[in-house]
Design a protein with these regions (language model features):
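A short beta-strand-turn-helix
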Residues: 75-96, 120
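Thiol/disulfide oxidoreductase modules built on the thioredoxin-like
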Residues: 94, 153-157, 163-213
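Hydrophobic beta-strand positions
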Residues: 78-79, 100, 184
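N-terminal targeting signals for export/organelle localization
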Residues: 1-74
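Short active-site neighborhood of thiol/selenol oxidoreductases, capturing the structured segment around
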Residues: 86-109, 115
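Extracytoplasmic
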Residues: 69-74, 92-95, 125-128, 177
Length: 214
């Protein structure tokens, strides 16, 4: 009887150890299979911004004169997304649409669903990169944080979003003066067009097609 009891004891202890090891393995697999940057503790609404090149002059949407920035070499802005991913506006020969958005701006809040639908419906012209910049971020203003706002709106995953610095370094480099703000940069890295305000998607499509020669 004593021998049988000892054998059962060893079996129970072995089973417990197996459960513990198995549980640890499951935790390890779960951790390695998920992006730790997506946890709320690793999301940042701001990032350090570096700018290469000269800043563009401030955009005056009320002026009938030709935008002085057209034809200028666009600065290259580098920063991080909300989860720490490195992002740069250097299109490396690809035409780029830059979209500057502020979470508290009602015009931006109306424009974002249009942009989302534009992409979902496959109406975004091919052959361009779209990069958004979340700027003007202020925890004291409504609809904060921008990361959650854009997630709720199902902002396209293929469109990277740069979290601007608290002093709007990225926005200032491109001459932002109002929201939402659009800058189209051609394949040579030159400014093709700048726009501000609520822009209809058919108008945006037409301008992009002009830029890429469609």
């Amino acid at each position: 009887m004593s021998k049988s009891s000892s054998g059962n004891g060893k079996f129970i202890v072995g089973a417990i150890i197996a459960v513990i090891i198995g549980g640890a393995a499951i935790v390890a697999i779960s951790s390695s299979g998920s992006d730790s940057n997506t946890s709320s503790g690793n999301i940042s609404e701001f990032s350090e911004i570096t700018v290469a090149g000269d800043a563009l002059p401030a955009f005056d949407s009320t002026s009938s004169a030709t935008d002085a920035a057209i034809g200028m070499t666009a600065p290259v802005v580098s920063g991080k997304g909300f989860t720490g991913t490195e992002i740069t506006t250097d299109g490396a020969g690809t035409p780029t649409l830059l979209v500057f958005l502020a979470h508290w701006c009602p015009h931006c809040q109306r424009e974002v669903p249009l942009l989302v639908e534009w992409e979902k419906d496959g109406k975004t012209p091919t052959g361009i990169d779209v990069i958004a910049v979340a700027t003007g971020t202020d925890p004291a203003n409504p609809n904060f944080p921008p990361s959650e706002w854009l997630a709720r709106e199902e902002f396209p995953a293929l469109w990277p979003v740069i979290a601007d610095s608290a002093d709007k370094k990225a926005a200032n480099a491109f001459g932002l003066s109002g929201y939402p703000y659009f800058v189209l940069v051609d394949a040579q890295g030159k400014v093709f067009k700048r726009l501000s305000g609520e822009i209809p998607m058919d108008q945006l499509t037409e301008i992009i097609n002009q830029m890429i020669g469609v």
